């Protein structure tokens, strides 16, 4: 199937949308739609933002819940409220608008707080971002033991080797 082709990798949401569209409107020219989809797939690898969104989509498909912390002063309450659910969360700590250019080029690393049960690994998130060509650096990790749940919060920085060291804001020599 097309999903196994490298040009279409990470486009599951697009295929789902296309299926729904074709199921409701049979007058759509399928050949042109598929051609556009193929061109988008080929171009996606060229843009950091597409690869970033593809990685987040893959994480979501594995059950990770994605969110953004709009204000730094709300980080603690956002983290604790997500930890109380006992589920796996990826909390983005800086805005996409501040980390990517309007053309989709990454300007600085994206910081995440991975919130998950201590008994579960979060390495699948790291593997997904690595598979999309990003490099990773760990920040701090803390244990959250409230509400009878043993949860962890780990900071993960996602970027690429072309970013200036000063943009990382961390000891950038220990990439994963």
Give the label of every model feature segment.
Residues 1-85, 159-176:
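Intrinsic disorder/low-complexity detector
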Residues 30-38, 100-114:
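Short, conserved helix/loop micro-motifs enriched in His/Cys and acidic residues
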Residues 68-108:
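An N-terminal amphipathic alpha-helical segment
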């Amino acid at each position: 199937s097309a999903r196994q082709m490298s040009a279409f990798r990470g486009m599951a949401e697009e295929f789902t949308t296309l299926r729904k569209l074709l199921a409701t409107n049979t007058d759509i020219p399928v050949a042109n739609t598929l051609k556009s989809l193929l061109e988008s797939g080929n171009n996606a690898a060229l843009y950091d933002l597409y690869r970033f969104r593809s990685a987040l989509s893959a994480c979501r498909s594995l059950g990770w819940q994605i969110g953004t912390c709009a204000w730094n002063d709300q980080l603690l309450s956002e983290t604790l409220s997500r930890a109380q659910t006992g589920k796996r969360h990826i909390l983005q700590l800086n805005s996409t608008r501040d980390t990517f250019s309007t053309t989709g080029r990454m300007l600085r690393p994206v910081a995440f707080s991975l919130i998950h049960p201590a008994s579960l690994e979060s390495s699948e998130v790291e593997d997904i971002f690595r598979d999309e060509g990003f490099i990773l650096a760990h920040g701090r990790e803390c244990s959250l033991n409230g509400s009878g749940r043993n949860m962890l919060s780990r900071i993960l920085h996602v970027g690429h080797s072309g970013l200036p060291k000063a943009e990382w804001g961390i000891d950038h020599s220990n990439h994963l």
